[in-house]
């Protein structure tokens, strides 16, 4: 099993906390592979984790240049990799994997709370985390998917992705090309492609009771705007059964706030009345054109009301323009 995290050294304030939690809670003897974008970042990451023997750090461009790298033959995949750095989570983990290897791709802002092992996939399907909303953006790329009849999964969170290497490179290259221009300043394109792969490969969502994603709901945005502290925001989360917490978006910066890690541990220690099945998967839910049109209408309505100006966020329709 190849456990892979793509990151830059600039993310160390929160990533160090999360990666150390992974190294501490992972029960197996698997190595953790960190991929980064420059020799300077590689050196900083090596120094940051020098005390953890199971962590290996690589400069991903060096691996990409290997003549045996099959992805070099696909112009769409090459174009994807040259886009936003986050998009490399779709390509670069395969650089450290052999055909048939289990691959687990983890965001550097996923914090692990309990001892665990990753359950093997064992087939050609895909596992992803679940979130109530979705981050399928920009609208232009989602529109292109519907125009080309490329099925999309709803509720996709990209904190963790697990599959057996390699991905279907020919199909991925075709899908990237079919989606047309991909705005390189929009990290969320990655989520659109994982969503496409989910419907192509099958599989399901990891149990969200165990694998929790921070939800940047409208209510939470308003709480933050009204001055809620990191401690108050974290107190809203239910970690009573959680194995991992994807602290996406602004939540990642709370992890290195004074006392935050201890608070998360305390919340995880709360007694739970239930015991979840750690192997349970929920089937992928299709994202429909009808729901997409409703989301676009809601966005226009909220924009007209001044909601996005109030909370200080960009209207979804403006992302990628």
Regions inferred by a protein language model and the residue ranges of each:
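Catalytic core and acceptor-binding pocket of nucleotide-sugar-dependent glycosyltransferases
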Residues: 153-247
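N-proximal low-complexity "stem/linker" segments adjacent to membrane-targeting elements
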Residues: 1-20
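Conserved catalytic core of nucleotide-sugar-dependent glycosyltransferases
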Residues: 116-180
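GT-A fold catalytic core of metal-dependent nucleotide-sugar glycosyltransferases
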Residues: 85, 89-135
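Active-site-proximal specificity loops/subdomain of glycosyltransferases
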Residues: 45-99
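Short, acidic, metal-binding catalytic loop of nucleotide-sugar glycosyltransferases
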Residues: 21-29
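Short internal beta-strands
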Residues: 31-37
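Long, low-complexity C-terminal extensions of enzymes
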Residues: 223-321
């Amino acid at each position: 099993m190849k456990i892979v995290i793509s990151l830059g050294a600039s993310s160390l304030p929160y990533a160090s906390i999360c990666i150390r939690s992974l190294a501490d809670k992972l029960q197996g003897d698997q190595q953790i592979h960190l991929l980064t974008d420059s020799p300077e970042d590689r050196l900083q990451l090596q120094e940051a984790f020098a005390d953890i023997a199971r962590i290996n750090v690589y400069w991903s461009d060096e691996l990409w240049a290997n003549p045996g790298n099959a992805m070099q033959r696909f112009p769409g995949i090459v174009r994807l990799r040259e886009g936003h750095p986050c998009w490399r989570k779709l390509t670069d983990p395969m650089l450290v994997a052999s055909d048939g290897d289990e691959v687990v791709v983890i965001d550097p802002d996923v914090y692990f709370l309990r001892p665990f092992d990753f359950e093997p996939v064992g087939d050609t399907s895909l596992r992803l985390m679940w979130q109530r909303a979705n981050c399928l953006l920009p609208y232009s790329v989602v529109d292109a998917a519907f125009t080309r009849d490329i099925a999309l999964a709803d509720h996709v969170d990209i904190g963790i992705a697990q599959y057996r290497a390699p991905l279907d490179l020919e199909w991925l290259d075709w899908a990237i090309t079919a989606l047309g221009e991909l705005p390189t300043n929009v990290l969320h394109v990655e989520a659109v492609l994982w969503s496409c792969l989910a419907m192509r490969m099958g599989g399901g969502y990891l149990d969200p009771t165990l694998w929790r994603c921070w939800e940047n709901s409208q209510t939470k945005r308003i709480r933050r705007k009204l001055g809620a502290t990191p401690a108050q925001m974290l107190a809203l989360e239910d970690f009573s059964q959680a194995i991992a917490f994807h602290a996406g978006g602004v939540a990642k910066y709370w992890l290195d706030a004074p006392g935050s890690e201890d608070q998360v541990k305390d919340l995880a220690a709360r007694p739970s009345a239930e015991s979840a099945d750690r192997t349970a998967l929920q089937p992928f839910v299709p994202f429909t054109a009808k729901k997409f049109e409703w989301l676009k209408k809601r966005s226009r309505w909220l924009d007209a009301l001044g909601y996005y100006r109030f909370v200080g966020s960009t209207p979804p329709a403006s992302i990628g323009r």
